Amino acid sequence: MSQRVLTTESGAPVADNQNSASAGIGGPLLIQDQHLIEKLARFNRERIPERVVHARGSGAYGHFEVTDDVSGFTHADFLNTVGKRTEVFLRFSTVADSLGGADAVRDPRGFALKFYTEEGNYDLVGNNTPVFFIKDPIKFPDFIHSQKRDPFTGRQEPDNVFDFWAHSPEATHQITWLMGDRGIPASYRHMDGFGSHTYQWTNARGESFFVKYHFKTDQGIRCLTADEAAKLAGEDPTSHQTDLVQAIERGVYPSWTLHVQLMPVAEAANYRFNPFDVTKVWPHADYPLKRVGRLVLDRNPDNVFAEVEQAAFSPNNFVPGIGPSPDKMLQGRLFAYADAHRYRLGVNHTQLAVNAPKAVPGGAANYGRDGLMAANPQGRYAKNYEPNSYDGPAETGTPLAAPLAVSGHTGTHEAPLHTKDDHFVQAGALYRLMSEDEKQRLVANLAGGLSQVSRNDVVEKNLAHFHAADPEYGKRVEEAVRALRED
């Protein structure tokens, strides 16, 4: 096999890739050295803005196979036939730290799944917890600012973290998840994934159901203690990435079983708490899990930058039979994610291979044109306006999901209150489900952070939330904080 020739970006052969052109042996370098200038300029532009959240991530390809009939609940084509397989790409991530952060840290994990269906790409952009810290997107920038590095100290500050939580009692449920054992998964393979939000399914008869997604790991749950994680983060900062890549390369393919909870739309208005509140779960006793299928990851990306860093997910990427719910946090994300990708990757990010729909030959069929890095050569007979007389793409007239009934006046509103719509009952229930060992680790983790908070009023507000969740919970955290402060 003949040796390939090294070329410039324009395709010209490179004569010397070891020495820059200069004026004599020891003279200054020449600006006419096209290869040097091009190589340095290209290097300066290798990085793009990192994600403002979920920057540190890993990903893999695989497939989703339907194992159980759910055609009575959704007419989504990729879910309509038992045995049907759909190609997928799954990106895991941490949330708060930067691209260079460690994997083994206490942080929620992103679980962003792209289904390359025959009706377009469907993105399910979830986490490894079923709930979240807040329920209104207007608080999201402030929440993330409080969790990321302080602009003065350049480090994550317990004062900021717990101060925001002190003013956000709705975060108590997710805090209990995060500070418990599942706050540090041993690997991406050994954690569950959740859609977290409530979505809408519509069947072929036009009947609608609200739905929650649960991906249960087939590898079993494995977690790290704070000490184990600190040691691993120092020894192998990319531990989760290493584990995922090596497992797939060995042929040990990680898998998850998908279950859903389904609520008839008519039941939502009278349910005992707001079913669209992402800080709460639906009790399985009310809406039991129904198995749908199996997710398997079996192929690593060839290029992490091209396929993981440039992967773009948006909760607004639906397919026929699936749509959004009135969940406020979801509604905010429907805009924010796609807008973040337009900033980070450009308006044509859907033309990148990892993001391009496979359902339409040649890419998406619409009248969007041009923009930075446009690679889709639509011209000549492809008109850039609609309607037209040239057989261009036309609308179907069929909405992806059933419409939702709304009423009331415009304005800013508190989330609707139901009989048991408080911030603490489910946090207390989660605490009481834990074993004694799990409770001890939860209390120790919380106390370790709270003991570093400088303001007593912030500590007291947080303790009040844990007392409201469960008196024993609050008392144990309070005593542990006091003991650490006395030391």
UniProtKB/Swiss-Prot annotation:
Cellular compartments per GO CC: cytoplasm
EC number: 1.11.1.6
Taxonomy, superkingdom: Bacteria
Residue positions binding heme: Y337
Similarity annotation: Belongs to the catalase family.
GO biological process: hydrogen peroxide catabolic process; response to hydrogen peroxide
PROSITE patterns from the UniProt entry: CATALASE_1, CATALASE_2, CATALASE_3
Pfam families: Catalase, Catalase-rel
InterPro entries associated with the record: Catalase, Catalase_3, Catalase_AS, Catalase_clade1/3, Catalase_core, Catalase_haem_BS, Catalase_immune_responsive, Catalase_sf
Catalytic residues, chain numbering: H54, N127
Cofactor dependency: heme
Function: Decomposes hydrogen peroxide into water and oxygen; serves to protect cells from the toxic effects of hydrogen peroxide.
Enzyme class: oxidoreductase
Organism: Streptomyces coelicolor (strain ATCC BAA-471 / A3(2) / M145)
SMART domains: Catalase
Protein name: Catalase
UniProt KW keywords: Heme, Hydrogen peroxide, Iron, Metal-binding, Oxidoreductase, Peroxidase
Keyword Oxidoreductase: yes
